[in-house]
Structures are given as structure tokens and as C-alpha cells.
A protein has these predicted regions:
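Short alpha-beta junction capping motif
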Residues: 252-301, 388, 394, 404
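Short beta-strand elements
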Residues: 195-198, 232-248
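Aromatic-rich peripheral "rim/lid" segments of glycoside hydrolase catalytic domains that contact
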Residues: 103-168
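Flexible loop/turn segments at secondary-structure boundaries
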Residues: 32-34, 107-114, 188, 264, ...
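Beta-strand-rich binding/interaction modules
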Residues: 155-197, 206-212, 220-229
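Catalytic beta-strand/loop cores that center a nucleophilic Ser/Cys/Thr
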Residues: 2-11, 15, 284, 304-403
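Outer-membrane beta-barrel proteins
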Residues: 76, 148-150, 167, 199-201, ...
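Substrate-binding/catalytic cleft of secreted carbohydrate-active enzymes
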Residues: 1-120
């Protein structure tokens, strides 16, 4: 559902669970793939040797992207941790679910090499998420935010429900769930307390949040923290707020927007013009891969083989985005260096271009991380000098993505 449903924190499995007459446990939750950390190879000092990692590292070197290995690892891993949070919370939001089970917290280096762990094969942390952050959404008590969306318009009133997944021994009755909305500098935008009146266990209804969002005229990320008073139980959520004026179609002097590089566009480039090009999806289908929002499941090699043998569609097989948040492109689009929820409509309408024949050192502005089998250099947004002009290429149908 994470790859196909507009990001929210209200979906759950309640309807399916209600139809079962036996306890239901969610099986192998997660399994979001992380690009391998080749520094782990030095840990193999005994009888085992990671020949598989050596092969994957050599493939990346042949593709001319060796120096990006750590960036691929961190960007895919940080995003995988957010996906685990979303998947686990969907289980916790489900009334009547008897529990959930991860295959493991660590990587599974067999069966095609499944680097799906938050821990490596030695049960050491990969440094992708702190224990405190993980405990915020995977614990005996978890405060939960229920909202229809992560992206809002300034001037709207932030509305959400709060619940608590409570399975600890002590009662929470008489305590309160404090919520605080802060900007990235830590300034408080709004706060409140919802009293916890239930003495029971399970999924507790707590209250509602209604917070008007002041208009600043700038896109920004805010962080909402939920904390149960007198305890260490707390959970956090990112939210994005954009100015009400979202017009993108007004004319920009000196910039040509095109879907085809025809004679007029090429002439503009030769004469020093600036062009924003949205290549037509069908026209370049053989030179692109599909848009995948989450990181690929388990490992690409195994499920590609299964899909082809059964004549089923093959996953795009990619592992999230890598970009530079300080790039001028993101002045009005706050972002991490990895994928996050605000990217969903853009990525879902994307068709990243294979740039394998570009110079080895060329790097897209927004790069899509490929899997360890193919190692394509994939561009979602990239720029080129053409003649005396500048060409910015966007491999996403932003008109189709503009749905919220």
C-alpha cells in the first residue's frame, strides 16, 4: 500500500482482521531493501567471506559510481527506516490485530542477498535510525498520529486524531498526551494536551488536534511530537506546508518549457536560452525504468526471476532518491537528501532515464538509486549545457502529479 496509496496515517487492516475468526498476526512486516554498506566487509575475519558484497562493489565500480556507495547506503537506509515506521504503525493502528512479526532486525545475506535489516549481519546497528527513534514507533506503548496527509497548504487548519497503542503493564489513565508542533529551528508553532481517560489496554482513543497554520509565504517542514507525560514514550512525524499560491503555469521570461526537443527548442538552446524539458514517457520507454516510491522489496534478483517465470510485471527495482537539499532547485521544496513523503506524487509519475552512457563523473541533481544487480545511473532531474544554453530535464509528469 505504501507504493500505491497517497501517504497518510489513517489506513489500517481492521476490515480484513474483522473477517477472521482466529487471531491474526502480521507476517514479515517491512523487508524494505537497503543498499549494502561495503565497509561491513572488513568485519569478516573468520571462515566466512562476503564474496557477494565483493561482486556488488565491483559492479558499482564498473558503472563509475564507487564513490557514491556510502551515499546510496545512507539515502536508501534512512528512507527504509521511515518505511518500517509507516508499516509498523499501520499494524499498531489496526483494531484487533494480535501482533506483528519482522523476519529479523538484521540483514539476510542469503537468497540473492537481502539487505533488509536495520542491523547488519553481525547484529550491529547500521546507524540509520537511533534506538530512541525506533522505540518511538516500536514499543509497548506508542503514541500515534492519524491524519489524511503529510502535505498541507498554509492557512489550512491542521486536523488529526491521536491514539495510543498501549500494551504495557501500568495504566495510563490520568496522564496526558502532549503534542508540540515545531519548525526546523525548534520554534513552537502550536501545542496542547489530550487527557488519557481510559484505564484499558489495546488501541486507545485519546483526542484530536486542531492547529491553524500561520501564513509565511514560504514552503517549510514542521515536526509534530507526541509524548506521554511522565514517561519516555514519544513519537514524531514530519509535515510539510506550502504557500496557497501554487501556480506553476505562468510564463517565465527566458525559459522555454517543452515536451519535445524540436527545432524551435534546439535553436533556443544554441542561442543561450534556458529550457525545461519534460520528455514524453512513451517516447523513451526503452531508456527508462518505472517510478517506485518505496525501496525494492527483499531483493531484485529473486522477484525479477519469479515475475518473469510467471509472466507478471517486474518491479522497477529501485531504492529511493539521492539528492542535495542545498541545491537551488529546492528553495521552495524542502527535502532531505533521501526520499520522504512529500515526494510521493512526483515519484509515482516518474520514469527515470538511464544515463549509463553519460560521462562517468556526471551526477544528476536528483538521482534514483538502482539495485545491486543492474547498477544503472538513473536521473529523475538533471541539467546539461547545450550549445550556449542550459537544459533542465525532469523525468516526471508533474501535471499528472499535481493532484493534491
Amino acid at each position: 500500500y505504501l507504493n500505491h496509496t497517497y501517504p497518510n496515517t489513517v489506513m489500517d487492516f481492521s476490515r480484513a482482521v474483522a473477517r477472521a475468526d482466529v487471531p491474526v498476526v502480521s507476517h514479515e512486516t517491512g523487508q524494505f531493501q537497503v543498499y549494502p554498506d561495503y565497509r561491513e566487509m572488513a568485519k569478516y575475519t573468520g571462515v566466512l567471506y562476503p564474496y557477494n558484497m565483493e561482486v556488488f562493489r565491483d559492479r558499482l565500480a564498473r558503472a563509475g559510481m564507487s564513490e557514491q556507495a556510502e551515499d546510496f547506503f545512507l539515502a536508501s537506509g534512512r528512507w527504509a527506516a521511515e518505511l518500517y515506521k509507516a508499516d509498523i504503525e499501520m499494524d499498531l493502528r489496526t483494531e484487533g490485530l494480535a501482533g506483528f512479526q519482522l523476519l529479523d532486525l538484521q540483514d539476510y545475506p542469503g537468497q540473492g542477498s537481502a539487505y533488509v535489516g536495520i542491523l547488519d549481519a553481525f547484529m550491529d546497528s547500521k546507524g540509520l535510525v537511533s534506538p530512541e527513534r525506533w522505540k518511538g514507533f516500536c514499543n509497548e506503548v506508542v503514541p500515534l498520529l492519524l491524519t489524511e496527509k503529510f502535505c498541507w497548504t498554509e492557512g489550512e487548519t491542521l486536523t488529526a486524531r491521536v491514539k495510543v497503542a498501549h500494551y504495557a503493564a501500568r495504566s495510563l489513565q490520568g496522564t496526558g498526551l502532549a503534542w508540540t508542533l515545531r519548525d526546523e529551528q525548534g520554534h513552537v508553532i502550536g501545542k496542547g494536551i489530550c487527557p488519557i481517560v481510559s484505564s484499558g489496554r489495546g488501541l486507545l482513543e485519546v483526542g484530536d488536534i486542531r492547529q491553524p497554520i500561520p501564513v509565511t509565504g514560504k514552503a517549510r517542514r514542521l515536526n509534530l511530537e507526541l509524548a506521554i507525560e511522565g514517561t519516555d514514550y514519544k513519537n514524531t512525524y514530519p509535515l510539510w506546508f506550502y504557500p496557497e499560491d501554487r501556480s506553476t503555469k505562468e510564463s517565465h521570461p527566458g525559459i522555454t518549457v517543452a515536451k519535445r526537443l524540436d527545432g524551435h527548442v534546439l535553436s533556443a538552446l544554441e542561442n543561450g536560452g534556458k529550457v525545461l524539458w519534460f520528455p514524453e514517457r512513451d517516447r523513451y520507454a526503452s531508456q527508462t525504468v518505472g517510478g517506485l516510491f518505496q525501496t525494492d522489496d527483499w531483493n531484485y534478483r529473486m522477484f525479477e526471476t519469479i515475475s518473469r517465470n510467471n509472466r507478471k510485471p517486474v518491479s522497477p527495482g529501485t531504492m529511493g532518491l539521492l539528492t542535495d537539499p542545498s541545491h537551488p532547485l529546492f528553495r521552495s521544496f524542502p527535502t532531505d537528501f533521501h526520499t520522504n513523503w512529500q515526494w510521493f506524487p512526483i515519484v509515482k509519475q516518474s520514469y527515470p532515464l538511464i544515463l549509463d552512457h553519460f560521462p562517468k563523473g556526471y551526477r544528476p541533481i536528483v538521482q534514483v538509486i538502482d539495485n545491486i544487480e543492474r547498477n544503472h545511473k538513473l536521473g529523475l532531474i538533471f541539467e546539461l549545457a547545450v550549445g550556449k544554453g542550459k537544459l533542465l530535464v525532469c523525468m516526471s509528469d508533474l501535471e499528472a502529479a499535481d493532484d493534491k
